[in-house]
Amino acid sequence: MTKKHLDTTLVQAGRSKKYTQGSVNSVIQRASSLVFDTVEEKKNATRNRAKGGLFYGRRGTLTHFSLQEAMCELEGGAGCALFPCGAAAVANTILAFVEQGDHILMTNTAYEPSQDFCTKILSKLGVTTGWFDPLIGEGIAELIQPNTRIVFLESPGSLTMEVHDVPAIVKAVRNKAPEAIVMIDNTWAAGVLFKALEFDIDISIQAATKYLIGHSDGMIGTAVSNARCWDQLRENAYLMGQMVDADTAYMTSRGIRTLGVRLRQHHESSLKVAEWLAQHPLVERVNHPALPGSKGHEFWQRDFTGSSGLFSFVLKKRLNNDELASYLDNFTLFSMAYSWGGFESLILANQPEQIAALRPGGEVDFSGTLIRLHIGLENVDDLIADLAAGFERIV
């Protein structure tokens, strides 16, 4: 059989009979203690405890193994570590590869908690962090130090949505520091719209809380690694006590089955909203990777197979507190909430100085209020009507 379509892989991955045991979905195996019938069975389990066999609940159960196998098939990895949330996935994956005296490079458009982990935790451990512009490309070579151990990407960038020239960055890192680990927060692409490991990235990290679970009712993080990094990542996660419960692992596997159709709708609807916003007289610019003119659009077009529902736009004016309240408090379909990736549409606002505070060594090139949207699965014309009504409140 020729290579399967992504939609088929999403439905089939991790569903072998050893995990489903006669049902359609993988079984939910809740267990701390796993019983051995013989001394020899216990010896074998102990010997193979790092190889995906039943040993102890913290190493995983059939429910976890099913999800991990699916993630490896989807992202092309040698192994997948599971974490209680996306922030834990980022923090523990970084910790697995650094020690006192090391240096890491992180994009200055990374998710705020990822930045905070570097400045507030790693700094105490004697690990220094340098920051780079998301559009740096091959210029990153100039920032690599002899002790640079990790280069951390996030594409698109948080809030302002810049897309990296990943091949240029990775090539520069491999030439200048071949032993350095390249990892990426790949949450926006859900691990499937951008196949990170195919671009010679070592580890693809996700807040699977977002699109994989897909219903805003669970929290989990994943890190899919290549063979070079897998043993070290796996053992560090185990020693740090990182795990998720079987029910959340099951919910993630279940969410994966509909990921393809959901992402297509997110792409279609978000792009239609972005194109409408780009023509609106109150909007200065739209930051949507699939929209021509968005920063790094050419790299999205070359390297990605689609877009998700998260993007932002900048108003021509800065809203004052009263205008912000009038604008945000009265939407019918858009809710104010952190996170994203579920079926519902969300909205948040940030002033330019708030964004600037999240850009170490960088600046913002706009003065109006930035609005971040997550376009859900509602009818797109209804969503546009809701946004249009919002603009009427701030004219």
Q: For each predicted feature, which ranges?
A:
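N-terminal "arm"/small-domain region of PLP-dependent enzymes with the aminotransferase-like
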Residues: 1-61, 69, 371
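Conserved PLP-enzyme active-site core in the AAT-like
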Residues: 2, 10-19, 80-280, 287, ...
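C-terminal core of ALDH-fold dehydrogenases
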Residues: 3, 10-27, 323-360
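Glycine-rich beta-alpha junction loops
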Residues: 15-17, 30-36, 188-190, 210, ...
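Conserved N-terminal alpha-helix of the aminotransferase class I/II PLP-enzyme fold
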Residues: 38-88, 113-120
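PLP-dependent enzyme catalytic core of the Aspartate aminotransferase-like
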Residues: 119-120, 128, 149, 176, ...
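Short hydrophobic/aromatic beta-strand micro-patches
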Residues: 224, 312-314, 374-376
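Conserved small-domain helix->loop->beta segment predominantly found in fold-type I
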Residues: 271-332, 336-341, 355-365
